[in-house]
Amino acid sequence: RQCLEDVWEPDATMGNYLYNWSLKADGTPGTQFTYFKIHKKALYEWACPVHEYLRYKGSGSEKKVFIHGMVLDHYPDPEKSRKSYLPLLEMAVQEEPENDRMTYYLGREYMYVGRWQECITTLKRHLKLPTAWWPEERCASMRWIAKSYHHIGDNTKAYCWYYRAIAEVPHMRDPYIEFAKLAYLLHDWSTVLYLITAALKIKEKSRHYVNMGYSWDHTPDDLGAIACYYLGMYERSLHHAQNALTFSPDDERLQKNLVLIRNKCKEIGISEN
């Protein structure tokens, strides 16, 4: 409450704050983004039957403040079924076919349930909607389209859509890391290294959209270590492996990888700094 009172202003209409949608086993953030449900009651109304959001109905301009120090942790019930989401989203889009927000959520839900072609079709339509201008959400649509193309066996199109996602929002790690994970599966080591190098240059999380936990944990350096190893760049592989282990020091696979890379470096005369 004190954090809210410290930043609230008389003309403020909404308060934004950090939201941890998921937490890792050690309590650190998994999926994290900025949330928005603190508001002046008279100026907003709830909209949509699922993934509800606040629709502004005031006469003046919105004024949002960010509440530093306020964090909401979400503890999802792993036993809870998502079966109700899809029909509600289909109903929402049927009622408002031009609603870009619901169209995006519907396409994403098709991905979650493995209906890949419907995901592709729906999210391509999302990208064509005149109100679908938010770069981060457009980027997310492109990422899910890419993922869906991979699952139906068209990796050429998956690559194309990941490149489009990066071009849409080059300052977020997520499209680079997800693309790198696909390239890893295909043993495309030079592409993995290129993407990881670019991703690690991004030092700040987005304050405007979802940040996936795997973009900010050991994953980038882990992928970098493996790619460099197979490219014969052993000293650089060692550096990435050491960094990966600092994020997850108890991970046995990362420990074994580091030992393997160290041994290779010793074998060819590279000393560890």
Q: Language-model features: where?
A:
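Structural signature of alpha-solenoid helical repeat junctions
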Residues: 98, 137, 171, 209-216, ...
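"A position-specific structural signal for the A-helix of alpha-solenoid helical repeats
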Residues: 105, 144, 178-181, 185, ...
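Catalytic-site signature of metal-activated, phosphate-bearing donor transferases
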Residues: 1-121, 125
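TPR-repeat structural position
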Residues: 82, 116-117, 155, 189, ...
